[in-house]
Amino acid sequence: MAQNDYFVIVYQVLKYLYECLKKGEKPEACYLTASAYNIHENYWQYIILSLITEEYVKGIAVNHTKDGVLLGDLPDAIITPKGISYLFENSLLEKAKKTLNAVKEMVPFV
């Protein structure tokens, strides 16, 4: 899987939100942006809207405008129990995890 693959990004987002939950911290908005994953804004919005629709994430405000979608309240994002279950039980997310680990081995500073 490529680093910009849907399941790789979903894994990273859910893993980050789960770590924030366990630490009792609010997520930093800078980690919940398209630029954090080097992807196009439309692709990022698709991913986040999918996570919200599937009820894996909640707390993000979605505002539909004539120019598109605005995502707000990013520091209020939280992974749901359904999202935690998906994180640990989805085989495609396991492949994404392996992809990220392989990249870290090749590029130590990632």
Predicted feature descriptions by range:
Residues Y6-A36:
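Short amphipathic alpha-helical interface segments
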Residues L17-L21, L51, L87-N90:
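Generic structural signal for hydrophobic core residues of well-folded globular domains
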Residues A29-T33, V62-D67:
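Short linear capping/connector segments at secondary-structure termini
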Residues N38-I60, L74:
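Short amphipathic alpha-helical interaction segments
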Residues D67-A102:
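Short, amphipathic alpha-helical interaction segments positioned at domain boundaries
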Residues V103-V110:
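Short acidic DE-rich linear segments
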